[in-house]
Amino acid sequence: MDANLRRKLDELPAEPGCYLMKDRAGEVVYVGKASSLRSRVRSYFDPGRGDQRAFVALLDELLGDLEVIVTRSEKEAVLLENELIKKHRPRFNVRLRDDKDFIVLKLDERHPYPRLEVRRAREKRQPGARYFGPYSSASSIRETLRMVNRHFQLRTCSDHVFDHRKRPCILYQIHRCPAPCVYEVAAEEYRQSVEDAVEFLEGREGELVERLRGRMDGAAAGLRFEEAARLRDQLQAVERSLEKQRVLMADRGDRDVIGLYREGPDLVVQVLSMRAGKLQDAQAHPFREQEFPDEEILSSFLSLYYEHTDAPDEILVPLEPVQAEALADVLSERRGRRVRLLTPQRGAKADLLDVARRNAEQGFRAWHEHDERREQALAAVERALHLARPPRWMECYDISTFQGALAVGSGVSMKDGEPDKANYRRYKVKAVAGQDDFAMLHEVITRRLRRALGEGQLPDLIVIDGGKGQLNAALAAAKDLGVPTRPSPGNPDAPFVELVGLAKSRLVDGPSLGTARVVGRRGRRAEARLADAAEAAEKGFVSELARSPERVFLPGRKDPVVLRQNSAELFLLARLRDEAHRFAITFHRKLRRERNFQSVLEEIPGIGEGRKRALLRHFGALRRVREATPEELAQVEGFGPRQAAAVHAFFHRPDAPPIAADEPSGAPAAAPGGGPTDASPEAVAAATEAEIDAALADEDASPEPAA
């Protein structure tokens, strides 16, 4: 240990605060908190503790500097540690998945007819709104939202659509919504449905069942049979939900149970969420390289986890976390009610901790098995493509264009077989005019590799979505910049990046694989573009319609490598390629929508580029601009009454341009005149899922700015 570090250890204050450990390059590798900085930090270097952890044994070699921040209280230290971990993302700290991986249901109770909305857990909580969750998967929130909307009949349309709808949507026709947007619905009656939904989402189904049964009996006694039937359906749905839930505690309390399982530096923290005594959710959180004590890891985890979800009355933990009292104060302050951290040693609550620990162990085993399969897939890609090393950092690039217009490129990244969205990039093609995919790809790869040279980091493998021509364009870009695409025999440590082209499967000729050309009724041959053999027979064509396997083109090889169908290497590469295609298409559609928006607004006098962008940000769609009132238009940034009146008059003049519905706005509209429609419940469910998917759409990280 150098003299400067020894001096800092000697001068540490015996006060609460946070400490930042830095490596010799100045990067923060660990952030911790303490009620006494002197005692906590010195304990890592105390040979009398008998601590044999690998990280502590390497502290002398790893640690380059130490920084401390004194706080006024232990509670401030808890809050500061949370912020420092999010800011520096230290290597040895617990880091939860990105906040946008967690989703919640929001109910804005300030609205007279509130609805459930899907929101990211990281969004700032609004006063007067109630939140349920978080849900760790889109499928779980889909199931919950579908059931609530089906049986409690809350509206699904946005506030903007609610304010401007002229006729009820299909949900009204199939008795899934009372259509408060059009018809007069008693606020008290709707509020009753909201309260029922809240009780269901909070896990208080027992109270809800009793109340529903009483209201059903009352409606039947009053000869209101339709209302009684609706309440019966709600009651049956809630009772079916109760049958699926296991009661673990007789006291019906709300608590989370934390389990922890460790092997070496890797560990899993399991959270069992219990509401009204029933297990509602279970989430496993795996972490690597966690050399610090379990009590520090647990304290950091609880502070981060409950930042975006409400803490229950009790949190059962397997051991007392660092600064447990201050942590409980922070959680209570966030929640607005008291939160207790308990470490039971015997009884039913101790049994719950054992259940959580066994679940954590099971999650640990599943996590490591997944890691093994991922390592095997990377090794299989290395063997199949004759690579010089395992492709731990892979990127894939695709071009999207429409008749040469609005050409864009996309780049997606995978590290260790998992999406690395921080390195996703979007490119506007700048130097190519017309339809020239090869030149566009050359430009995109040139820009990517130029940035990589500036950063001093090259990926292991770049996959090009395309065949030999696209691969050659990318190789030419690498050659122009002097980027090696194979390891140097004389300098094996020199950086290089390998490139391959992944071509999609296609219809091919041949008796064993089917034929790409089919014969019609008059003997005319045509390209086969039919979905399946049944469609071919219906249209009078004869074809087996088999597809070729996926093909990978390698530099310097004439024939492509044909990957085994359903193999791990094909699945990994196809997943990377499909993600690049999705990312490019999404960006291209966004640009088309913006261009269409701008072109219509160009006809409005007095509306410049700045106000066009403000309208797009505020409303998001031309249809919503057209439906807006002058008062709503005047609320847009940079707009006054005069500009608002000009826009409103433009869209409401007799020869106004027709505007197509350019995005979903909740459920589909009912037939004119309120008559029945042919929309099925499946179509309605799809509309609801479309709204969820839109809310859960990945936010494109770090887009490449256009010139």
From Swiss-Prot:
The keyword DNA repair applies. The keyword Cytoplasm applies. Residues 655-707 are annotated as: Disordered. Keywords: Cytoplasm, DNA damage, DNA excision, DNA repair, Excision nuclease, SOS response. Residues 660-689 have a biased composition (Low complexity). One of its GO terms (molecular function) is DNA binding. InterPro entries: DisA/LigA_HHH, GIY-YIG_endonuc, GIY-YIG_endonuc_sf, GIY-YIG_UvrC_Cho, Hlx-hairpin-Hlx_DNA-bd_motif, RuvA_2-like, UVR_dom, UVR_dom_sf. Its main location: cytoplasm. Residues 206-241 form the UVR domain. Residues 690-707 have a biased composition (Acidic residues). Pfam families: GIY-YIG (PF01541), HHH_2 (PF12826), UVR (PF02151), UvrC_RNaseH (PF22920), UvrC_RNaseH_dom (PF08459). Residues 14-94 form the GIY-YIG domain. It is found in: Cytoplasm. GO terms for biological process: nucleotide-excision repair; SOS response. GO terms for cellular component: cytoplasm; excinuclease repair complex. Belongs to the UvrC family. The UvrABC repair system catalyzes the recognition and processing of DNA lesions. UvrC both incises the 5' and 3' sides of the lesion. The N-terminal half is responsible for the 3' incision and the C-terminal half is responsible for the 5' incision. Interacts with UvrB in an incision complex. HAMAP family: UvrC (MF_00203). This is UvrABC system protein C. The lineage of its organism: Bacteria, Pseudomonadati, Myxococcota, Myxococcia, Myxococcales.
